[in-house]
């Protein structure tokens, strides 16, 4: 459900027989995916971090 990175990781473990199990695995991972780090981009940001990012972008836009 969602990111191609999560499906690629589970498909790499077992492409053939894991086809049916992959759907079940994805459903159980969805909550975990929200907290995972994809190549430096954190998916489940807390509100404090969102405020920090928005403040940084405002500063950059002023320059």
Curated annotation (Swiss-Prot):
Location of region: Disordered: 1-40
Low complexity composition bias: residue spans: 1-12
Pfam families with a match to the protein in the record: OCC1
Signal sequence interval, chain numbering: none
Domain of life: Eukaryota
Cited InterPro entries: OCC1
Family, as annotated: Belongs to the OCC1 family.
Protein name as catalogued: Overexpressed in colon carcinoma 1 protein homolog
Organism of provenance: Bos taurus
Lineage: Eukaryota, Metazoa, Chordata, Craniata, Vertebrata
């Amino acid at each position: 459900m969602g990111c191609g990175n999560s499906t690629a990781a589970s498909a790499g473990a077992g492409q053939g027989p894991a086809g049916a199990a992959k759907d079940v695995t994805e459903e159980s991972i969805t909550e975990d995916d929200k907290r995972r780090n994809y190549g430096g981009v954190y998916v489940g940001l807390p509100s404090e971090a969102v405020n920090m990012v928005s403040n940084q972008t405002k500063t950059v836009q002023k320059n």
